[in-house]
Curated annotation (Swiss-Prot):
Species whose genome carries this gene: Danio rerio (Zebrafish)
Keyword annotations of the record: Coiled coil, Glycoprotein, Glycosyltransferase, Golgi apparatus, Membrane, Metal-binding, Signal-anchor, Transferase, Transmembrane, Transmembrane helix
Membrane topology note: Single-pass type II membrane protein
Primary enzyme class: transferase
Catalytic activity, EC: 2.4.1.145
A GO biological-process term: protein glycosylation
Source taxonomy: Eukaryota, Metazoa, Chordata, Craniata, Vertebrata
Protein name (Swiss-Prot/TrEMBL): Alpha-1,3-mannosyl-glycoprotein 4-beta-N-acetylglucosaminyltransferase B
Amino acid sequence: MRLRNGTFLTVLLFGLCGLISLSWYTAFSNSKGNVVDIYQREFLALRDRLHSAEQENLKRSKELNLVLDEIKRAIAEKQALRDINRTWSSLSDETKLKLWNVTSSKNVLQLPSIFHHLPHLLAKESSLQPAVHIGQGRTGVSIVLGVPSVKREVHSYLTDTLSSLMTELSPAEKEDCVIVVFIAETDQQYANSVADNLKRLFPGEIQSGLLEIISPSVHFYPDFSHLKESFGDPKERVRWRTKQNLDYCFLMMYAQTKGNYYVQLEDDIVARPNYFTTMKNFALQQPSEEWMILEFSQLGFIGKMFKSLDLPLIVEFMLMFYKDKPIDWLLDHIMWVKVCNPEKDAKHCDRQKANLRIRFKPSLFQHVGTHSSLAGKIQKLKDKDFGKQTLHKGHANPLAEVTTSLKTYQHFTLEKAYLGEDFFWAFTPVAGDFIRIRFFTPVRVERYFFRSGNIEHPGDKLFNTTVEVLPFDNIQSEKEALKEGREKTPKYQRTEDGFIRIGKFENGIAEGEVDASFGPLEALRLSVLTDSPVWVILSEIFIKKAE
């Protein structure tokens, strides 16, 4: 019995050992299988990555081959272009234009371009690139001043002109302006000598971006030998005026992207003080954007301001007729086309053109040259409005609506006086009459100045007339400015309709500072308190904005 039990235990022990051994073996086998699977997956992933890298390498290799082919093609095309240019130069301008029309576009419609008017420009790639190009490429300014300059036989006025223009600019104005000198000569040696002289005289202005110097390519101008004589002008004068038209076109094309306004000048002028801000504000104060030319001199093409947006139209019109008429006639024709009705008379046409061409007085630029750019011509042109004692004085005032109860005499309106174009003239004022200036947006005003009467009618003054303001924030201004000191005594008198009296006319003039505590003003008013024995002239209005 005992033996049987021992045998049973032995068998049981061996069975357990076998079972444990089998479990260990199974576990070991499974563990080994998992490791193999992991390595197998990693090798497969590595193979995929290597394959992807190989494909990417092939792609890059193809791209590099394409780039190399493009470089080879460009070199070949450049060589072919040289050969084509040699052939092209032997073709007539008419043939060149026809070929350009065929090859320039796949469109059915052929768009007009500068090459239709100047087909010779197709002969050289550099024909529209400046030969001399000095400057910082400043853009985004308010005004670009264009100064074309040509070689004169006797005397050059260019450096004196530039000195005058720059001297009359304030530091802030110099940051808001570009002066472009266009040396309108294809003689490269002469152009370089002028440019070098300007670099020596005005290094700071060039470095700052205020002054730029350009000259045309030797291939820019067409052959002038076949021009037709017209309007009684000899061939040399026809050539001179034709080239001058192209000079203006080149300068305008260069300047049009640099600023908001472009002013055409000449190289033999002097400028009045404050000319830049006067021009800028006169342009901004125009009641309409319909104007095309603002004139700051009555002479020729001096001091003519254009909107930069209008320059492409003007250039294209000039290019169409550059051989036919001088620039001043062409500008008049543009305005005729825009506003004149052929069924109306000449007076109606003149009235319509007057809305496009607006004159500022007094003139801001004076012509000083006596030796014309046309060889042998002596001209003693002077602007009679420059430096002349005028019957009014204009200022750049804040944008506003001006109204009055006074009866205006003829065309001497209050609006013209406020814009600085003329004086205001009205019949005899009576008590209760007013002149009101209502600002389009509230304005902080530092000081005011009103002058009545002028040199021809010194007695036509305002008498017993007060200056009144209407603050935008009436409640706050009353708290801060209407009371003075601890006794709270009135500092200013308030009218029934809310205006505050701050000054009055004495000997025909009212001037003074505006209390800063008033804040922005909504309006300013001149109020007549008693009947006047005479008519009234308002010859100067100046509302100075606070900085």
